[in-house]
Amino acid sequence: MLERTLSILKPDVVKRNIAGQVNSYIENSGLKIIIQKMCLLTRYQAEKFYEIHKSQVFFVPLINFMISGPVVVQVLEGENAISLYREIMGATDPKKANSGTIRGDFAENIDANCVHGSDSLENAIREIRFFFSEYELLSLYEC
Protein backbone atom coordinates (compact mmCIF):
# COMPACT_ATOMS: atom_id res chain seq x y z
CA MET A 1 0.00 0.00 0.00
CA LEU A 2 1.31 3.45 -0.91
CA GLU A 3 1.92 5.36 2.32
CA ARG A 4 3.51 8.50 3.62
CA THR A 5 5.53 8.75 6.80
CA LEU A 6 7.36 11.46 8.68
CA SER A 7 11.11 11.37 9.04
CA ILE A 8 13.15 13.66 11.25
CA LEU A 9 16.89 13.90 10.80
CA LYS A 10 17.88 14.86 14.33
CA PRO A 11 20.39 17.54 15.40
CA ASP A 12 23.30 15.07 15.47
CA VAL A 13 22.83 14.35 11.75
CA VAL A 14 22.76 18.05 10.84
CA LYS A 15 25.68 18.91 13.13
CA ARG A 16 27.83 16.09 11.72
CA ASN A 17 26.88 17.04 8.14
CA ILE A 18 25.69 13.53 7.24
CA ALA A 19 22.16 14.35 6.04
CA GLY A 20 23.14 13.47 2.47
CA GLN A 21 24.37 10.04 3.56
CA VAL A 22 21.19 9.40 5.54
CA ASN A 23 19.09 10.53 2.57
CA SER A 24 20.97 8.01 0.41
CA TYR A 25 19.82 5.18 2.70
CA ILE A 26 16.25 6.45 2.37
CA GLU A 27 16.37 6.77 -1.42
CA ASN A 28 18.22 3.47 -1.91
CA SER A 29 15.38 1.73 -0.05
CA GLY A 30 12.95 2.89 -2.73
CA LEU A 31 11.31 5.58 -0.63
CA LYS A 32 10.92 9.06 -2.11
CA ILE A 33 11.57 12.24 -0.16
CA ILE A 34 8.62 14.28 -1.41
CA ILE A 35 9.13 17.36 0.76
CA GLN A 36 11.67 18.43 3.36
CA LYS A 37 12.66 21.50 5.32
CA MET A 38 15.19 22.43 7.94
CA CYS A 39 13.92 24.03 11.13
CA LEU A 40 14.94 24.79 14.68
CA LEU A 41 12.36 23.44 17.10
CA THR A 42 11.25 25.54 20.04
CA ARG A 43 10.96 23.87 23.42
CA TYR A 44 7.17 24.15 23.14
CA GLN A 45 7.12 22.45 19.72
CA ALA A 46 9.40 19.63 20.88
CA GLU A 47 7.35 19.05 24.03
CA LYS A 48 4.12 19.04 22.03
CA PHE A 49 5.50 16.67 19.40
CA TYR A 50 6.86 14.19 21.97
CA GLU A 51 4.08 14.66 24.57
CA ILE A 52 3.26 10.93 24.38
CA HIS A 53 6.59 10.37 26.20
CA LYS A 54 6.01 13.05 28.87
CA SER A 55 5.98 10.57 31.77
CA GLN A 56 9.13 8.78 30.61
CA VAL A 57 12.51 9.32 32.28
CA PHE A 58 14.09 10.20 28.93
CA PHE A 59 11.59 12.99 28.12
CA VAL A 60 13.63 15.99 29.35
CA PRO A 61 16.93 14.81 27.80
CA LEU A 62 15.07 14.08 24.54
CA ILE A 63 13.56 17.57 24.45
CA ASN A 64 16.90 19.20 25.27
CA PHE A 65 18.55 17.23 22.48
CA MET A 66 15.85 18.01 19.92
CA ILE A 67 16.17 21.76 20.54
CA SER A 68 19.98 21.72 20.57
CA GLY A 69 20.27 22.44 16.85
CA PRO A 70 18.45 22.33 13.53
CA VAL A 71 16.54 19.27 12.38
CA VAL A 72 15.40 18.24 8.90
CA VAL A 73 11.77 17.16 8.70
CA GLN A 74 10.74 15.11 5.70
CA VAL A 75 7.73 13.37 4.24
CA LEU A 76 8.64 10.04 2.71
CA GLU A 77 6.40 8.19 0.29
CA GLY A 78 6.41 4.63 -0.97
CA GLU A 79 4.99 1.15 -0.67
CA ASN A 80 4.60 0.33 3.04
CA ALA A 81 6.62 3.47 3.82
CA ILE A 82 6.03 3.34 7.57
CA SER A 83 7.33 -0.18 8.17
CA LEU A 84 10.04 0.13 5.51
CA TYR A 85 11.45 3.31 7.03
CA ARG A 86 11.39 1.81 10.53
CA GLU A 87 13.33 -1.16 9.14
CA ILE A 88 16.05 0.99 7.55
CA MET A 89 16.25 3.23 10.64
CA GLY A 90 17.25 0.25 12.76
CA ALA A 91 16.71 -0.33 16.48
CA THR A 92 16.31 2.73 18.71
CA ASP A 93 19.44 1.72 20.60
CA PRO A 94 22.27 1.77 18.05
CA LYS A 95 24.05 -0.98 20.01
CA LYS A 96 21.16 -3.25 18.99
CA ALA A 97 20.81 -1.88 15.44
CA ASN A 98 22.01 -3.99 12.54
CA SER A 99 24.83 -2.86 10.31
CA GLY A 100 23.41 -1.41 7.12
CA THR A 101 20.72 0.54 8.98
CA ILE A 102 20.88 4.28 9.58
CA ARG A 103 21.29 3.92 13.34
CA GLY A 104 23.59 0.93 13.06
CA ASP A 105 25.93 2.81 10.75
CA PHE A 106 25.69 6.40 12.01
CA ALA A 107 24.16 6.74 15.49
CA GLU A 108 26.52 7.58 18.33
CA ASN A 109 24.29 6.49 21.23
CA ILE A 110 20.67 5.94 22.22
CA ASP A 111 20.14 9.67 22.80
CA ALA A 112 21.81 10.85 19.59
CA ASN A 113 20.27 8.15 17.42
CA CYS A 114 20.02 10.15 14.18
CA VAL A 115 16.41 9.76 13.10
CA HIS A 116 12.76 9.64 14.05
CA GLY A 117 10.11 7.84 12.04
CA SER A 118 6.36 7.50 12.49
CA ASP A 119 5.33 4.18 14.05
CA SER A 120 1.77 3.91 12.70
CA LEU A 121 -0.49 5.31 10.01
CA GLU A 122 -2.38 7.38 12.58
CA ASN A 123 0.83 8.85 13.97
CA ALA A 124 2.20 9.46 10.48
CA ILE A 125 -0.85 11.57 9.63
CA ARG A 126 -0.63 13.50 12.92
CA GLU A 127 3.13 14.00 12.69
CA ILE A 128 3.09 15.13 9.04
CA ARG A 129 0.36 17.66 9.87
CA PHE A 130 2.43 18.87 12.82
CA PHE A 131 5.22 20.06 10.51
CA PHE A 132 3.58 20.60 7.12
CA SER A 133 0.49 22.60 6.22
CA GLU A 134 -2.15 21.34 3.81
CA TYR A 135 -0.97 24.05 1.40
CA GLU A 136 2.61 22.73 1.49
CA LEU A 137 1.42 19.19 0.83
CA LEU A 138 -1.03 20.17 -1.91
CA SER A 139 1.49 22.42 -3.65
CA LEU A 140 3.72 19.39 -4.23
CA TYR A 141 1.72 18.71 -7.35
CA GLU A 142 1.70 22.26 -8.70
CA CYS A 143 4.47 23.93 -10.66
UniProtKB/Swiss-Prot annotation:
Gene Ontology CC terms, in alphabetical order: cytoplasm
GO MF: ATP binding; metal ion binding; nucleoside diphosphate kinase activity
Name this protein carries in UniProt: Nucleoside diphosphate kinase
Active site per UniProt: 116 (pros-phosphohistidine intermediate)
UniProt-annotated location(s): Cytoplasm
UniProt record, GO biological process: CTP biosynthetic process; GTP biosynthetic process; UTP biosynthetic process
Family classification: Belongs to the NDK family.
Lineage, opening ranks: Bacteria, Pseudomonadati, Pseudomonadota, Alphaproteobacteria, Rickettsiales
